[in-house]
A protein has these predicted regions:
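Conserved aromatic anchor
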Residues: 33-45, 78, 131-148
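Proline-enriched interdomain boundary motifs that mark the N-terminal boundary
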Residues: 21-27, 117-126
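Beta-strand-rich modules
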Residues: 76-102, 176-201
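N-terminal Sec-dependent signal peptide, specifically the hydrophobic helical h-region
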Residues: 1-26, 47, 51
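Recognizes extended acidic, P/S/T-rich segments that occur
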Residues: 51-85, 154-182
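Extracellular fibronectin type III
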Residues: 98-118, 196-213
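Membrane-proximal extracellular "stem/stalk" segments
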Residues: 149, 159-213
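Structural signature of extracellular immunoglobulin-like
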Residues: 38-42, 50-55, 89-98, 136-142, ...
Length: 213
């Protein structure tokens, strides 16, 4: 905070635009491999435009992000250029205002799609039949497109007594038939998405309860 105040004072003394302050924070937010870079703007960002670049960790060359040059918003979708889960990436942002004043570049933390993305829980669809409960799972589409060969689901069946059973389903178009259930009994179910080779899983989905026939 003291350093920030000193920088503000220096800018005022030199009569330079406030945009020359470094951006305060760059942060990747990644859900289901949709990788969005967010940044906190300078204190006075009126009429500022932002320019975003990216590179692979270890590579010398910075590349412009298409669609994120001269933008006024405070975020940029880098999913297309940070799509390889085996790589690590950096991004950087600088601000510009008319007539041509520019801030210094601000660097993001190093980012890994594989390790930093969060996995969304799937959506459960339940049907009741004379034979029991039919469970279908709808995963997030971006995750299926990216990782469908490595996905599976854990299904949790909770009995009235509180006892819990666990089942597994493969991705992505299968259904699970739960036949060993009692008639006219309430059961609650949850599911989570698992990426096996990464040992990564989502939170459990919201609980859905049904009563058998």
């Amino acid at each position: 905070l003291l350093l920030l105040l000193l920088l503000l004072l220096l800018l005022l003394l030199l009569r330079l635009p406030l945009l020359l302050l470094l951006l305060l924070l760059l942060l990747f937010e990644s859900v289901d491999y949709k990788n969005i870079l967010h940044w906190t703007p300078p204190i006075n960002d009126t009429s500022l435009q932002y320019y975003v670049q990216w590179k692979i960790y270890g590579e010398p060359q910075w590349l412009d992000v298409d669609g994120c040059q001269g933008i006024e918003k405070h975020h940029c979708d880098l999913s297309g250029v940070t799509s390889d889960p085996r790589e690590w990436y950096y991004a950087r942002v600088h601000a510009s205002s008319k007539p041509a004043s520019k801030s210094a570049w601000t660097l993001s933390p190093r980012f890994s799609p594989r390790w930093d993305t969060k996995i969304s829980p799937p959506v459960l669809k339940l049907n009741i039949t004379e034979q029991g409960i039919v469970v279908r799972v709808k995963p997030p589409r971006p995750l299926v497109r990216k990782m469908h060969n490595d996905l599976f689901y854990k299904i949790y069946l909770v009995h009235n007594s509180g006892a819990e059973e666990e089942f597994e389903m493969e991705c992505c178009f299968h259904k699970l038939n739960l036949k060993k259930v009692k008639h006219k009994e309430e059961y609650c179910l949850q599911a989570e998405t698992v990426i096996a080779f990464q040992a990564k899983s989502s939170d459990r989905s919201p609980e859905k309860c049904v009563t058998t026939l």
